[in-house]
């Protein structure tokens, strides 16, 4: 049984406490206040219930009513405190009854009970109120840490994780932590104090009865553990299914045009219903098991009261070691201690659900940041000479076969300052990977990428990326205004700077014609704009950043002829005086590059100007001729 209790009750509680140790320290002052108010609430509760004994004795004339001998002096020993305090309390009540009346004494004691209850409930409220800043603050901190970690992780992490799964952890899992773990904070800080004070009171009333009561706690705890044993595993499965659901929603939103084009609404609805129903079935089992906590603890608590009432009756009727009003006070205190124990049992069902979600959150929080500054990195503020790929090989890990798959093999390339280098080749030849290595989105397995002779791994990541501007095939815009998107990389830019950048990017005209000009919102991912407009806003953003190095990744491949002309014109303005590395699908857009490198299966197989490569009649000319057809 000891091993079972350790695995089913103490192990989850240990994990729970470890989570609190991670997140509670900033809120220690609230924790201290909560403990203080909980102690005050427990003491006041004991005194308010203690008032029941004289009330019962007066009301029912037990043993002839209030009975006391003469006033007793305390002899200084701890063992006599209870006897002296009880005797003198009864003595003063008896004197009050003689001087006034029993009914007035009953009223005074009743008012005392009401006053103590008022103070107790006030302390109880304050103890709960001081927990709320801890609870909400921890959830906020988890979300902040999760978001900060997402922005810190390398791109390689997200190539192996579904966006919907990450969103599910950010939303559903954090919410489950709040509902399951943080809702148990009050229980953790309040109930141990209540149980301790009530337990001491029970011992003071009758140690024999308390010893008898303790014998029933382990089997009751074991019985509760049986019900909650599988809850954590089921909750983990439920949250995984919730991630599948969110991933499918995200996938559907991204592919809605294709779904409609192929009349696949019914198919997608069926797929979603399958995933959603699986989640519903699993979470239903979890919730049913969780809902057993209250009735189970209520039933076991009632059994305990009945057993104690039977044994207490023996002590009253057969041995006379305790009187009737005192046994009632004992039962009231026992019931008061059962309620916190019920909360513990309820938490034993709630906490495993939250722990399962926290495990999923920690998969992100504890993920290793692969791209980070080394200790004492070199700082760079300008680009003076050249970019160099020196014997660079890059591979990604095929987790299915547990092997490296090389995308680039022994790449050697020098890009002098002010020159434009174009990378061409079939899909999968490694063009975009080469671009990603310059700002160090990934680290190479072999060789090195150098900026002005310094390995990018030795540079501060922030300094390196400040030198680089990006314009991609898909313009990445945010759900904000034109102004906020253009100044995204330079928050201190003036309105004049933003307007000038928009003019150079051929975006000024359509921006100023919009409803609120530069303050007009562009919708989610720039959804209110055409493809060409989105790309020109993206170019304006790069112009405003004014980087010495420019990376273009098929910036015009998805545009119509008119939009391509406007964007190409904007790009040519942007490329002036800058070092540019461009990937192009349409070879016509890179004819004027200083050097064109042709990649095939991860290697540079040809290099030269457009005219030189056409004359060679090699791989580049084949690509060129195919586009002329």
Residue ranges of predicted features:
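Membrane-integrated ABC transporters
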Residues: 1-50, 59-113, 119, 126-131, ...
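Transmembrane helices of ABC transporter permease
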Residues: 33-40, 186-237, 310-323, 339
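Hydrophobic alpha-helical transmembrane bundles that constitute the permease/transmembrane domains
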Residues: 39-47, 114-125, 177-180, 184-199, ...
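Helix-loop-helix
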Residues: 201-215, 289-359, 364-365
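Juxtamembrane helix-loop junctions of ABC transporter transmembrane domains
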Residues: 45-53, 112-163, 167, 171, ...
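ABC-type nucleotide-binding domain
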Residues: 2, 9, 374, 380-629
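An intracellular "coupling" helix at the cytosolic face of ABC transporter transmembrane type-1 domains
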Residues: 25-29, 155-156, 172-181, 185, ...
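Conserved catalytic Walker-motif region of ABC-type ATPase nucleotide-binding domains
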Residues: 150, 272, 361, 389-391
């Amino acid at each position: 049984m000891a091993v079972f209790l350790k695995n089913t009750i103490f192990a989850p509680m240990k994990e729970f406490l470890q989570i609190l140790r991670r997140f509670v320290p900033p809120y220690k002052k609230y924790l201290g206040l909560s403990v203080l108010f909980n102690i005050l609430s427990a003491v006041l509760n004991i005194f308010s219930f203690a008032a029941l004994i004289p009330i019962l004795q007066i009301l029912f004339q037990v043993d002839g009513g209030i009975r006391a001998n003469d006033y007793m002096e305390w002899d200084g020993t701890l063992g006599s405190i209870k006897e002296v305090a009880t005797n003198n309390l009864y003595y003063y009540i008896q004197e009050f009854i003689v001087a006034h009346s029993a009914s007035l004494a009953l009223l005074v004691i009743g008012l005392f009970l009401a006053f103590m209850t008022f103070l107790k409930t006030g302390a109880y409220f304050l103890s709960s109120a001081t927990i709320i800043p801890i609870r909400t603050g921890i959830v906020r901190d988890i979300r902040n840490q999760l978001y900060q970690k997402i922005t810190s992780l390398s791109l390689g992490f997200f190539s192996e994780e579904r966006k919907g799964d990450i969103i599910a952890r950010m939303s559903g899992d954090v919410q489950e932590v709040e509902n399951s773990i943080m809702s148990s904070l009050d229980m953790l800080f309040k109930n141990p104090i209540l149980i301790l004070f009530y337990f001491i009171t029970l011992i003071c009333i009758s140690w024999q009865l308390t010893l008898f009561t303790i014998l029933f706690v382990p089997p009751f705890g074991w019985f509760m553990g049986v019900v909650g044993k599988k809850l954590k595993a089921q909750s983990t499965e439920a949250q995984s299914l919730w991630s599948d659901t969110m991933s499918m929603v995200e996938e559907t939103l991204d592919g809605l045009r294709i779904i409609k084009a192929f009349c696949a609404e019914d198919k997608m609805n069926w797929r979603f219903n399958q995933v959603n129903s699986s989640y519903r079935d699993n979470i239903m089992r979890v919730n049913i098991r969780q809902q057993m906590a209250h009735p189970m603890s209520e039933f076991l608590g009632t059994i305990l009261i009945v057993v104690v009432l039977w044994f207490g009756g023996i002590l009253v009727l057969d041995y006379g070691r305790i009187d009737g009003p005192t046994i009632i006070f004992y039962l009231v205190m026992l019931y008061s201690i059962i309620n916190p124990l019920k909360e513990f049992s309820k938490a034993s069902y709630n906490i495993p659900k939250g722990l399962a979600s926290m495990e999923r959150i920690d998969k992100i929080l504890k993920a290793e940041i692969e791209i980070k500054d080394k200790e004492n990195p070199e700082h760079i503020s300008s680009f003076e000479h050249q970019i160099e790929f020196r014997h660079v090989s890059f591979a990604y890990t095929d987790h299915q076969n547990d092997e490296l798959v090389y995308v680039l093999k022994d790449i050697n390339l020098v890009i002098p300052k002010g020159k434009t280098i174009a990378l061409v080749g079939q899909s999968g030849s490694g063009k975009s990977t080469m671009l990603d290595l310059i700002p160090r989105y990934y680290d190479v397995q072999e060789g090195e990428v150098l900026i002005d002779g310094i390995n990018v791994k030795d540079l501060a990541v922030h300094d390196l990326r400040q030198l680089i501007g990006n314009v991609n095939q898909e313009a990445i815009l945010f759900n904000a205004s034109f102004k906020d998107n253009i100044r995204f990389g330079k928050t201190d830019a003036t309105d004049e700077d933003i307007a000038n950048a928009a003019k150079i990017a051929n975006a000024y005209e359509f921006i100023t014609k919009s409803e609120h000009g530069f303050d007009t919102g562009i919708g989610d991912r720039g959804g209110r704009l055409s493809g060409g407009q989105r790309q020109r806003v993206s170019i304006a953003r790069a112009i405003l950043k004014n980087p010495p190095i420019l990376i273009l990744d098929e910036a015009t491949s998805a545009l119509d002829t008119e939009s391509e002309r406007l964007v190409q014109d904007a790009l040519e303005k942007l490329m002036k005086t800058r070092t540019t590395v461009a990937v192009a699908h349409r070879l016509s857009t890179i004819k004027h590059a200083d050097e064109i490198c042709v990649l095939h299966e991860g290697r540079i197989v040809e290099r030269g100007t457009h005219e030189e490569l056409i004359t060679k009649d090699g791989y580049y000319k084949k690509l060129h001729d195919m586009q002329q057809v």
